[in-house]
């Protein structure tokens, strides 16, 4: 998860997050180069005497500043389209879980395990243990296997929500009357935190998500839920 004063993205826990970090670095490099060139041209303009004020035509320059931005946009767009395709790619999932957003908690349904359903509420400060994270701990965590494709079916019971876990590279809107899906494969066990990322009312800030990722062999032994 994120650390205090952290400037970079969180460590990747899924292949799609690794792709997003790579694209972020690629786009940041392009934007840094553009910013440097613009600042250099601006500094050059401010420190150079205007000796060529009578120039009315410069077709070479016009050609360059028309073609160069188009090339830069293409170089940014192609990796972006690749990542977009990967995020929408749906392979044969090993597990399907339904997540339903409410004001202001989440409901999880394990349809592959006899229709197991439970709610996940934020823990009030009075119930926190030493080492727990304020505004991020829940009473019931969603338990997921690693090294297996998991499909999350996400919807909402009332208003717009968004099921988000940054370290997994997941952010899917929960829309009333609509069932969205996202497929991911976690690569590392651990406890990972997220929050509702769509303003959904007065207690929007008190709607955390906690995913407990465990090895596939342990998960296959039977549901391991903190109920």
Curated annotation (Swiss-Prot):
Mg(2+) binds at residue 198. One of its GO terms (cellular component) is mitochondrial inner membrane. InterPro entries: CcO_II, CcO_II-like_C, CcO_II_C, Copper_CuA, Cupredoxin, Cyt_c_oxidase_su2, Cyt_c_oxidase_su2_TM_dom, Cyt_c_oxidase_su2_TM_sf. Keywords: Copper, Electron transport, Magnesium, Membrane, Metal-binding, Mitochondrion, Mitochondrion inner membrane, Respiratory chain, Translocase, Transmembrane, Transmembrane helix, Transport. Binds a dinuclear copper A center per subunit. It catalyses: 4 Fe(II)-[cytochrome c] + O2 + 8 H(+)(in) = 4 Fe(III)-[cytochrome c] + 2 H2O + 4 H(+)(out). Its EC number is 7.1.1.9. Residues 1-14, 88-227 are mitochondrial intermembrane. The keyword Transmembrane helix applies. GO terms for molecular function: copper ion binding; cytochrome-c oxidase activity. It is a multi-pass membrane protein. Residues 46-59 are mitochondrial matrix. Cu cation A2 binds at residues 196, 198, 200, 204. It is found in: Mitochondrion inner membrane. The keyword Cytoplasm does not apply. Cu cation A1 binds at residues 161, 196, 200, 207. It is an enzyme of class 7 (translocase). Its cofactor is Cu cation. Its main location: mitochondrion. Component of the cytochrome c oxidase (complex IV, CIV), a multisubunit enzyme composed of 14 subunits. The complex is composed of a catalytic core of 3 subunits MT-CO1, MT-CO2 and MT-CO3, encoded in the mitochondrial DNA, and 11 supernumerary subunits COX4I, COX5A, COX5B, COX6A, COX6B, COX6C, COX7A, COX7B, COX7C, COX8 and NDUFA4, which are encoded in the nuclear genome. Belongs to the cytochrome c oxidase subunit 2 family. Component of the cytochrome c oxidase, the last enzyme in the mitochondrial electron transport chain which drives oxidative phosphorylation. The respiratory chain contains 3 multisubunit complexes succinate dehydrogenase (complex II, CII), ubiquinol-cytochrome c oxidoreductase (cytochrome b-c1 complex, complex III, CIII) and cytochrome c oxidase (complex IV, CIV), that cooperate to transfer electrons derived from NADH and succinate to molecular oxygen, creating an electrochemical gradient over the inner membrane that drives transmembrane transport and the ATP synthase. NCBIfam families: CoxB. This is Cytochrome c oxidase subunit 2. It comes from Macaca fascicularis.
